[in-house]
A protein has these predicted regions:
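Low-complexity, Pro/Thr/Ser/Gly/Ala-rich linker/spacer regions in secreted
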Residues: 67-74, 169
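Solvent-exposed, low-complexity, repeat-rich "mucin-like" stalks and linkers
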Residues: 1-23, 71-122
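Serine/threonine-rich, repeat-prone extracellular segments and beta-strand-based repeat modules
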Residues: 19-66, 104-168
Length: 169
């Protein structure tokens, strides 16, 4: 999850549904151990919501605060989803969630072969020298995991984005 350092509300864009109460987005609470400042960086937070029966669910995640003035010209990664739920032992391939990467004045989009092809040069494929994926997901164990996608430009600028993966029974 990424928010501008100028963001007023770190729950904006977050929603919650419950089988008993329906939409409980207005009951989402944010907690954190270390104070969140207006300094760009990564912060560990927990989003939680409760239904009227008192059942509480929590989602611990990393939130990135960024300075919009520093975003110009940096590589960008777009995922098809940013939060997914998997069942125990369900197959998972992190590359399946990559939609688009913009790096070095080139846009790469997912092709029919699931590779990222340059829009302006179909024969050019985004390689591992520019894109790395850190995948700690163990679908054999319940938990909340974060897959980190990082792209690096020829000038050495990097950008990362996270996919939150919840593995449940």
């Amino acid at each position: 999850l990424r928010f501008s350092v100028n963001a007023d509300d770190l729950t904006e864009g977050i929603s919650a549904e419950d089988c008993l109460d329906g939409t409980i987005t207005d009951r989402i609470r944010l907690s954190y151990q270390d104070e969140i400042s207006s300094t760009p960086g990564l912060y560990q937070v927990t989003y939680s919501a409760a239904n009227r029966a008192g059942d509480v669910t929590s989602l611990p995640v990393t939130v990135e605060l960024y300075d919009p003035a520093e975003e110009s010209g940096k590589p960008q990664i777009t995922l098809s989803e940013y939060l997914i739920h998997l069942e125990l032992q369900q197959a998972f391939e992190p590359k399946d969630y990559l939609e688009q990467v913009n790096v070095d004045q080139m846009t790469y989009e997912k092709g029919e072969d699931d590779e990222l092809h340059a829009v302006s040069a179909e024969d050019k494929i985004l390689g591992e020298e520019k894109l790395s994926i850190e995948n700690p997901v163990d679908t054999g164990k319940e938990g909340v995991y974060e897959v980190t996608y990082t792209v690096t430009s020829e000038e050495g600028q990097t950008s990362s984005i996270r996919l939150i993966v919840c593995v449940n029974e």
